[in-house]
Amino acid sequence: MDPAASSCMRSLQPPAPVWGCLRNPHSEGNGASGLPHYPPTPFSFHQKPDFPATATAAYPDFSASCLAATPHSLPQEEHIFTEQHPVFPQSPNWHFPVSDARRRPNSGPAGGSKEMGTSSLGLVDTTGGPGEDYGVLGSTANETEKKSSRRRKESSDNQENRGKPEGSSKARKERTAFTKEQLRELEAEFAHHNYLTRLRRYEIAVNLDLSERQVKVWFQNRRMKWKRVKGGQPVSPNGQDPEDGDSTASPSSE
């Protein structure tokens, strides 16, 4: 092993010489102080170029401890700098402003980050605004198309419903199926009287097991058919429609 490395290892074992060197930085110059005398360390860092690289590679911890050596091993300029400027000249009062200053910038960026977050959200909203507008326009267009289709369907349904009552009324007329006996009696009555009085209509309805409305509708249809065939207009002896006179004289049974 190299003598310098072995001396460094031996110097780490007894801590007293190291502390003596630290507390007596000018021991190299005068050699006398008020502290008890300690034997000088057998090594010096003025021989740094002669220190082999193998020792530093083999013992990195010891080489680092040796590099952080006593002040007397440093050059003269570093001695002067350390004497004029202590190593730790900071006072406890100086730490508080620094901590406050550190806290303030930390709090500042936090608030700024919040503001930036809100502003970024605002920017996102503003940038997303046109997209939302386009989406709203598209939804309104779809709604208008749906409404127009609904209106068309409703109009077609209304037309169908309008056509349905006519068809239903025709179906009702067709569903009114008279028997042969009923038709014979109605034809005989129509041959004698084209218009029926209310009383006579009631009697025929009771005799034929029909309603007065069915009898009235049958006579109306029969008169229309007779008018189309003959082309003439029948006139009652009194010059008015007996059914109309009966309807004005008495309330309708419908």
UniProtKB/Swiss-Prot annotation:
Residues 154-178 have a biased composition (Basic and acidic residues). It is found in: Nucleus; Cytoplasm. It holds the Pfam family Homeodomain. Coiled coil: none annotated. Residues 171-230 bind DNA. One of its GO terms (cellular component) is nucleus. InterPro entries: HD, HD_metazoa, Homeobox_CS, Homeodomain-like_sf, MOX-1/MOX-2. Residues 87-178, 227-254 are annotated as: Disordered. One of its GO terms (biological process) is somite specification. One of its GO terms (molecular function) is chromatin binding. Keywords: Activator, Cytoplasm, Developmental protein, DNA-binding, Homeobox, Nucleus, Repressor, Transcription, Transcription regulation. PANTHER family: HOMEOBOX PROTEIN MOX (PTHR24328), HOMEOBOX PROTEIN MOX-1 (PTHR24328:SF8). Mesodermal transcription factor that plays a key role in somitogenesis and is specifically required for sclerotome development. Required for maintenance of the sclerotome polarity and formation of the cranio-cervical joints. Binds specifically to the promoter of target genes and regulates their expression. Activates expression of NKX3-2 in the sclerotome. Activates expression of CDKN1A and CDKN2A in endothelial cells, acting as a regulator of vascular cell proliferation. While it activates CDKN1A in a DNA-dependent manner, it activates CDKN2A in a DNA-independent manner. This is Homeobox protein MOX-1. The gene is MEOX1.
